[in-house]
Each structure stands twice: as C-alpha cells, then as structure tokens.
C-alpha cells in the first residue's frame, strides 16, 4: 500500500470538497480511538480550519485522556486546529431520565440508549459545524460502514463526508503509523465507547477486524459452508451482519404512486 500517496490523495480530496462546498473546513469528533485520530490528522493537514470536539458521555478516563492528548498534539503541530471539550453527560442523563422505561418490559433499552449517545454527539457536531461554517467529517472505515454496519444510523453515520470509508481497519492503522499518531491510540483496543460497561468492538461483533476483512474479501464468491472451523464461523457472522445492515446504506424507501392515481 502506498501510504504516503494515499495520505496526500485524501488531504487533497478534503480540500477540493471543502472548496466546492464553500466550507471553511471541518469539525471532527475525537474519541481517543484510531479512526478519529487519523481523520482529524488528515483534516489538519489541509491547512483549512479544523475544530476537534471531544464529547464524553459517562466516558472511561483512559478514553478521555487519549482524546485530549491527541487534540493537544494536533494543536501544537497545526496552527489551523482548534479543540474543545463538550461534556454531554448532563444532557444525556436528562434525556435518559425523561424517556426512562422498564428494562424488563423493553429489553432493547440499553441498545437504544447507546444509539442515543451517538445521535447526541451527531447533533453536537452539526451544531458547532453550522456555527463555524464547517463540514462534519466522518470517521467510519470500510469494514464498519460497508461491511458489517457497525455504526449508528443518524449517529456516527450522520456525516457530510467520509475520508477513510474506502480503507479497511488494517489500512487505517498503517496511515496512523505514518501520521505519527500516538502509540497509546495505536495500541488501544477498539471500542465504540457507547456503553456504561466496557465492550470492545470484537466482543460486540463476534470477530476481529482482520477476520472481518478476510470475510469481506471472500463474501459473494464463497459461502460459510465452503470453509471449516473459525473461518466458517466468521463468514457466517459477516454474512448475518452484512444482510442486517442494508437499511443503513441503502436510500430511504419511497412509496411510488402509480401514474394512474394522479
């Protein structure tokens, strides 16, 4: 992979898109994870205005520390970068109390609240984006966005542009190393940070990113039954998740009215 060439390509693509959209730059949500670290660094290299937002909601201290350290590093390196921490915990707590229901009656309550966290962050990003004339830069990678749908509809999936959505997680790590993203972020176990209890991406999806990348490469030309053991299991997981996520990537269905009814 031509890492430097890919970096230059994405940075130029970002600059061109912002110019066409007549935007001043980008706002990026920074979580302390690898994807947001890479996207924010790429945005910083455009020399356009960049606002980094850290938006903790009952967040673990290690995630907060990584996010704040990363924002500090970028501010030191790039004069076009500004950073802000917006604690969304009080707003989320108020929302959760207002809509509280019995978990016994509604077993999907915790999942609904996890997605609500993501949507609250999306609302915040667009609020600050509109204040400053900035585009919301998404941080989803190829596996998450087009493979297994590991994102929240109208949450972290609600963005203006997706700079790294054509890169697998492994490729994102390669860019991170080239961009000199901190070792703490590069070594951190991937997690979406949407739960009160620690849940890694692998635990939630049932497979690691390298495993899912393999499954994505053989999906369509092979079936789970073509393999044995763990490979069969992983491809079955990928197939199930990929089919279930189609509503996230397909256009919103529109009820077409027959011509004769007009």
Put a short name on every predicted segment.
Residues 33:
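Conserved G/P- and acidic residue-centered "switch" motifs that form tight phosphate/ATP-binding loops
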Residues 120:
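His/acidic metal-ligating clusters that form di-metal
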């Amino acid at each position: 992979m031509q890492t430097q060439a890919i970096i230059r390509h994405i940075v130029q693509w970002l600059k061109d898109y912002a110019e066409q959209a007549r935007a001043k730059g980008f706002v990026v949500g920074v979580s302390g994870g690898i994807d947001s670290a890479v996207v924010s660094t790429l945005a910083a290299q455009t020399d356009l205005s960049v606002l980094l937002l850290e938006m903790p909601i009952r967040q673990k201290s290690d995630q907060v520390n990584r996010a704040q350290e990363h924002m500090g590093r970028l501010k030191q390196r790039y004069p076009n970068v500004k950073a802000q921490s917006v604690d969304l915990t009080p707003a989320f707590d108020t929302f959760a109390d207002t809509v509280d229901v019995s978990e016994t009656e509604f077993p999907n309550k915790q999942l609904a609240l996890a997605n609500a966290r993501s949507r609250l962050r999306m609302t915040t990003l667009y609020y600050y984006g509109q204040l400053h004339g900035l585009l919301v830069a998404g941080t989803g990678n190829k596996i998450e966005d087009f493979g297994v749908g590991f994102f929240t509809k109208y949450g972290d999936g609600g963005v203006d542009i997706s700079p790294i959505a054509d890169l697998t997680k492994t490729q994102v790590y390669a860019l991170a190393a080239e961009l000199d993203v901190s070792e703490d972020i590069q070594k951190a176990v991937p997690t979406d940070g949407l739960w009160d209890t620690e849940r890694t991406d692998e635990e939630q999806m049932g497979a690691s990113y390298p495993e899912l990348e393999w499954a994505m490469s053989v999906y369509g030309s092979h079936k789970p039954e073509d393999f044995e053991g763990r490979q069969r299991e992983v491809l079955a997981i990928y197939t199930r998740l990929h089919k279930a996520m189609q509503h996230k990537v397909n256009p919103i269905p529109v009820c077409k009215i027959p011509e004769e009814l007009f």
